[in-house]
Each structure stands twice: as C-alpha cells, then as structure tokens.
C-alpha cells in the first residue's frame, strides 16, 4: 500500500507528491506498512470486535468516542498495542480520507464508523442512500462456489449484507484475495428491486443488499474475468 502524504500548506492527505488543492509538494505522513495495518485494525474494530478496545457502537455503527480518543483506547487496550505507540487521531483521519473504497466515515462530532461489512452479532444497521440509478452490479467469487450460488443465490454469510460493486475490476480484485480461480457474477439491479431488495451505496464503488441475492437476479457469469478486465483496458 502506498504511503499517505500531507500538504504542509493546506493539510490535505493524499497519495500524490503534489497537492491537488494548492500545488505544493507534499510530505510523507504515514508509511505504507503502517497504513495497511491501521486500516485493517480499524475494519476489525468497527465491523467485528469493538469491545476489544473498550468501544461501543450505536445503531448506525458510530463509536462512542471521537477518533482521538479511539487512538488512545487502541494504545491502551488493544492486545498488540505495543505496535501502535505512534498512533494519533490524525493518523486515523488520514486513513479515512484516503481510503480508496470509502470504507469509513467520520461525522461532525469526530466519531467514526465503518459504512458496511458488520458482523451479524452486532446490532448495527447503518443508514445508507438507495442506489436508484445503478443498473448492473458485480460480485467476485471463487469458481468452486459457482454451482451453489447459481442454485441458492449469493448469501451474506457472516455479514448483514451481500457486497457488490459497480466496477468489474474491483470485483476481480476482491475475488483474488480469496482464490486463484475467480469468476464474476453480473447482477441485475432492477430485478433485485422487483424482489424487494434495495441496493444501497456504501462506499465509492461498493453497494450492499440486505438478504440473499436470488439466482434469477444473476444474469451472466464472467468465467475468465482477467481477460475481460484486460480487454476493457485496451
């Protein structure tokens, strides 16, 4: 993962060496290794195990403290806290503002939440905008799951919702995290709506659907997604 840089003039966080806002040369703020580790830790705390750092989440998924207090609780309570002695609230803000998928959100009180991906055991249901104009969505999975999915649909498994994307390449990247033999399922969003399933926008290219995506909403299977994505780039 790329380092996060900061503009010394306007304070904008970016991956670029020149600030898009004011044109100044940026300085490194958080190296790529720490950025990746912190992003994964935030995902874990905000989606699955907030109690491990003495944090409570409300119904919308927001923490009971601001990001600066969250940094202090991580340094005090997290089991591997010795690796996070450097952490401040500003590092959390930087990770949120530069997250390519828009996984996190900070409200006007400085509280943070994950926008999607929560475990079923947490009583969290974030309010997310309905994706009214999206027509086609993608879901990447392993080839060995295909027969079961075409028979039973795409299930949320341990999560509250099925994750989809409007970007075929993103679906491939997601699938490749779990398998060497990916396929991409193409989902008709209008058919979802006819089933009473509402696609909601949860991140920059991420959409969620509460419940199982029925098999008849899967209109196509891209069996060689690498070739498909490469041909789109040409």
From Swiss-Prot:
GO molecular function annotations of the record: NAD+ poly-ADP-ribosyltransferase activity; tRNA 2'-phosphotransferase activity
Protein EC: 2.7.1.-
Key word NAD present: yes
One BP term from GO: tRNA splicing, via endonucleolytic cleavage and ligation
Enzyme class name: transferase
UniProt superkingdom: Archaea
Keyword Chaperone: no
Lineage, uppermost ranks: Archaea, Methanobacteriati, Methanobacteriota, Methanomada group, Methanopyri
Organism: Methanopyrus kandleri (strain AV19 / DSM 6324 / JCM 9639 / NBRC 100938)
Name this protein carries in UniProt: Probable RNA 2'-phosphotransferase
Coiled-coil residue windows: none
Similarity comment: family membership: Belongs to the KptA/TPT1 family.
InterPro entries xref list: Ptrans_KptA/Tpt1 (IPR002745), RNA_2'-PTrans_C (IPR042081), RNA_2'-PTrans_KptA (IPR022928), RNA_2'-PTrans_N (IPR042080)
UniProt entry keywords in alphabetical sequence: NAD, Transferase
Function noted in UniProt: Removes the 2'-phosphate from RNA via an intermediate in which the phosphate is ADP-ribosylated by NAD followed by a presumed transesterification to release the RNA and generate ADP-ribose 1''-2''-cyclic phosphate (APPR>P). May function as an ADP-ribosylase.
